[in-house]
């Protein structure tokens, strides 16, 4: 009898053990003095299994195919204390994925594909002590990343892609404040692992390096020999060996700002920029899309770089102003270099090409503002000429009251031009003419850049309030209004009145069309915005008909860099 009872007990225990160890396919469950656990190693799992027991205290799913932690995936496992998800393919953590895990003390996510972490998710885990994120792809830490991790004793961010960290990340850490103020003496050390990251040791990392140098117990670095990866002059050096200076805005200079060279000669424009961190240099010139010039960059010293723009075989069209701009995160600076071309006879040259035919002397050029940005505007123009494949244009641009304006020569087939880096509250004039002709009525736009605009307006537009067109505009972007110089009344007063009427209409009908069009401008002209003689109307009507015939022609464009 006793043997039968013993046999049944053994069978029962085996069944219970089998059921317990095979709780999920490919996984095993167990119970020890710490509670019940689930272990899944090298399985084909692509997601967290459904129906997890509520009394689990430890979950370990490693070397599987998890790619995401969905919202509230562990919310019903409220007893969970240890969560190991190492060596999976996790790239996304939902901001609410840790919901309900108030008892979680350990989270390990080593060897995944995380580029960022939703740090506010840790508001759900106030008792977290261990956070292991090593061997991921994290490349940035926001200043308040550690705000909801007041009880950490181990933070591992080693072997990620961190290059720059603000010292405020740790200065804003509640644990750092409490330890420094001795509010709660720590029962254990706080271990930080930050090694094996591609640290960029320029002025932006200065505060963090000083913080690392000042660390004292209970804060301990797992590896105190943090190493610079860049820039080249500091690569391989330890943090304690580098002394970083404060960041400064670029200062640009040029040894020569006026260059005159013969037609066909080679010209090299040079500018230097001193900045911390190192500035990025770019050249702005009108014909960038037409001709590819070579830009040679070299380092003068740790803070200074030099750029050389090589113009091979100087053409007449290369004559003009070249701007060297250097910028870093603090701002930008520029210098303008003037290039003139001498003809074989010794006089200044202008774009070559056949002389304007008598019929082209009075060609009507339709010019309009096509785009506006925070930094400038883009204009477009149309003109019907006898030989469009050989027709050159001249852009005249500068402040409205400037005696001499910059001239930029545009080759055949180009019908757009952009200007950037405009000053606020400044009146500018831009004209488009044939070859070297002087601007005439209908070929210019005068515009005033805005000032005192709020942040939303700054994102939407820079140029606003008024655009003065010397003859006629076919389309005007939102926020711009047109007047003509031959109006019989005060143009600015009329534009201001139109602006008030438009704002009133927009407030009354917020879903209405906000884009100014030729139709709306034409209606305004009928009310007296401008008047024309019958002769001018007939001439423009003929030009408009020609333009309409070529409306669908392909027009390559060149953008200002």
Curated annotation (Swiss-Prot):
Pfam families xref list: Ig_3, LRR_8
Q: Which residues form the LRRCT domain?
A: 197-249
Region ranges (Disordered): 507-561
Q: Does the keyword Signal apply?
A: yes
Which segments constitute the Ig-like domain? 250-342
Question: So which domain of life are we looking at?
Answer: Eukaryota
What residues does the Fibronectin type-III domain cover?
Answer: 364-449
Q: How does it sit in the membrane?
A: Single-pass type I membrane protein
Compositionally biased residues, Polar residues: 508-523
Q: List the coiled-coil residues.
A: none
Alphabetized, the UniProt keywords read: Disulfide bond, Immunoglobulin domain, Leucine-rich repeat, Membrane, Repeat, Signal, Transmembrane, Transmembrane helix
Q: Which CDD domains match?
A: FN3, Ig
Segments of skewed composition (Basic and acidic residues): 528-547
Q: Which residues form the signal peptide?
A: 1-21
- One annotated Gene Ontology cellular component of this protein: membrane
* Swiss-Prot/TrEMBL LRR repeat ranges: 55-76, 79-102, 103-124, 127-150, 151-172
One GO BP annotation is:
camera-type eye development
**Cystine bridges:** 271-324
Q: Which residues form the LRRNT domain?
A: 22-54
Under what name is this protein listed?
Answer: Leucine-rich repeat, immunoglobulin-like domain and transmembrane domain-containing protein 2
Name the species this protein comes from.
Danio rerio (Zebrafish)
The organism's taxonomic lineage, starting at the top: Eukaryota, Metazoa, Chordata, Craniata, Vertebrata
What gene makes this protein? Answer: lrit2
């Amino acid at each position: 009898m006793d043997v039968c009872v013993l046999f049944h007990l053994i069978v029962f225990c085996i069944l219970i053990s089998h059921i317990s160890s095979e709780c999920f396919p490919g996984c095993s469950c167990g119970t020890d003095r710490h509670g019940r656990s689930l272990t899944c190693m090298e399985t084909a799992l692509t997601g967290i299994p459904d129906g997890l027991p509520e009394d689990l205290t430890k979950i370990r799913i490693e070397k599987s195919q998890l790619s995401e932690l969905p919202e509230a995936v562990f919310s019903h496992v409220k007893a969970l204390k240890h969560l190991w998800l190492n060596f999976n393919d996790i790239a996304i953590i939902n901001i609410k994925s840790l919901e309900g895990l108030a008892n979680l003390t350990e989270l390990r996510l080593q060897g995944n594909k995380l580029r960022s972490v939703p740090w506010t998710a840790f508001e759900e885990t106030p008792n977290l002590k261990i956070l292991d994120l090593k061997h991921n792809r994290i490349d940035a830490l926001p200043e308040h990343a550690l705000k909801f991790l007041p009880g950490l004793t181990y933070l591992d961010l080693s072997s990620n892609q961190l290059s720059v960290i603000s010292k405020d990340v740790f200065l804003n850490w509640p644990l750092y404040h409490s330890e420094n103020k001795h509010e709660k003496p720590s029962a254990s050390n706080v271990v930080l692992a930050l090694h094996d990251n591609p640290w960029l040791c320029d002025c932006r990392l200065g505060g963090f390096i000083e913080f690392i140098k000042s660390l004292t117990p209970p804060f301990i670095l797992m590896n105190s020999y943090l190493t610079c990866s860049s820039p080249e002059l500091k690569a391989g050096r330890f943090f304690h060996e580098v002394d970083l200076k404060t960041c400064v805005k670029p200062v640009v200079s040029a040894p020569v700002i006026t260059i005159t060279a013969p037609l066909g000669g080679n010209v090299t424009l040079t500018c230097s920029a001193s900045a911390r961190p190192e500035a990025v240099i770019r050249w702005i010139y009108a014909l960038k899309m037409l001709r590819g010039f070579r830009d040679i960059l070299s380092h003068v010293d740790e803070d200074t770089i030099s750029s050389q723009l090589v113009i091979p075989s100087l053409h007449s069209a290369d004559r003009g102003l070249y701007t060297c701009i250097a910028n870093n995160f603090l701002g930008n600076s520029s210098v303008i270099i003037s290039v003139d071309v001498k003809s074989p006879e010794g006089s200044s040259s202008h774009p070559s090409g056949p002389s304007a035919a008598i019929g082209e002397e009075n060609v009507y050029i339709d010019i309009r503002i096509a785009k506006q940005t925070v930094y400038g505007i883009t204009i477009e123009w149309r003109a019907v000429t006898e030989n469009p494949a050989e027709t050159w244009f001249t852009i005249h641009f500068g402040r409205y009251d400037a005696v001499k304006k910059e001239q930029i020569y545009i080759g055949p087939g180009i019908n757009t031009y952009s200007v950037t880096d405009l000053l606020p509250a400044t009146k500018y004039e831009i004209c488009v003419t044939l070859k070297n002709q002087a601007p005439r009525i209908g070929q210019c736009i005068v515009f005033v850049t805005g000032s005192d605009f709020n942040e939303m307006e700054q994102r939407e537009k820079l140029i606003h309030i008024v655009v003065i067109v010397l003859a006629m505009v076919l389309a005007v972007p939102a926020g711009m209004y047109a007047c003509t110089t031959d109006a019989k009344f005060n143009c600015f007063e009329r534009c201001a009145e139109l602006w008030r009427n438009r704002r009133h209409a927009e407030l009354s009908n917020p879903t209405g069309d906000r884009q100014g069009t030729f139709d709306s401008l034409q209606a305004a002209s009928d009310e007296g915005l401008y008047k024309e003689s019958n002769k001018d109307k007939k001439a423009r009507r003929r030009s408009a008909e020609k333009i309409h015939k070529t409306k669908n022609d392909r027009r390559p464009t060149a953008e200002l860099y």
